[in-house]
Amino acid sequence: PAVYHALTREDLESRLAKTGGTPYRCASVKTALGGDVQLPASAINAMRRDVLAQLTAQRGRVKPARLHPYNALAPYDGMTGEPQLTVSVRSASQITARMLALRPTVLYVPLAEILANPDLPGRLGVETQLAAVLPRVTWSGEDRQLAAQLREVYALGVRQLLVGNLGQLKIAKAAGFAVRGDFGLNIYNSRSMQYLRAQGVDSQLLSFELTLPQIRDISKAVPSEVLVYGRLPLMLMENCVIKNRTGTCACDAGVTKLVDRMGEEFPIVKDGGSCRNV
């Protein structure tokens, strides 16, 4: 005659935990058995397979897309008249009399360079606005130092900042500066331009990847700038490759270069007053 054994907690948990050949792993099993329960192993296995099949079916369901009404963008016409010249320099030594004679509308200078040359604001004509360029990356641990530098440059008469990431918008506004957007914001479409307008940004350098027709058609919710001459920054590195290579801080000793297998040279410079490399 057949011999029946009562189902034990250990037997039940062992069979339910068998998920081999499936993408699942059983982390734990909770059981509640009362009395002498008898259940064939085949029934337990079938129950486990059914549960896993239901789980797979739930995972395969596609959530319906959330649709929102399309809101047409408000039209903004671009500036009329001749384009205005804005100039960005890496060091104060690049600010020559010949360059100032061009009467740029805005001159962008790294924050650290302005602090190192406090006479710079007084050297510019009334037709040229001076904007301090913030480092593209600032860690939260640098906030106190940055705040002190902003107070110092504000005392020198600087009232505009060029910011390269969205996190700096709040910092700049809180410090009382007008804000201009740098290429790091990667503005590529009209909705982004209108967002910047809502955030109080005064101008925006458009993405390098835009074509001339795209530049023409993008919303002019804020005055737009395009880079027409100069080197394009390829990447930003947290660690100073110059110091790691030479063992000394030599950013100001000359231009360091990377050379690829085709012989192309890529200058490496520091990002503002930081030890990060561009």
Give the ranges of each region predicted by the language model:
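Active-site pocket-lining/capping segments in soluble small-molecule metabolic enzymes
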Residues: 1-278
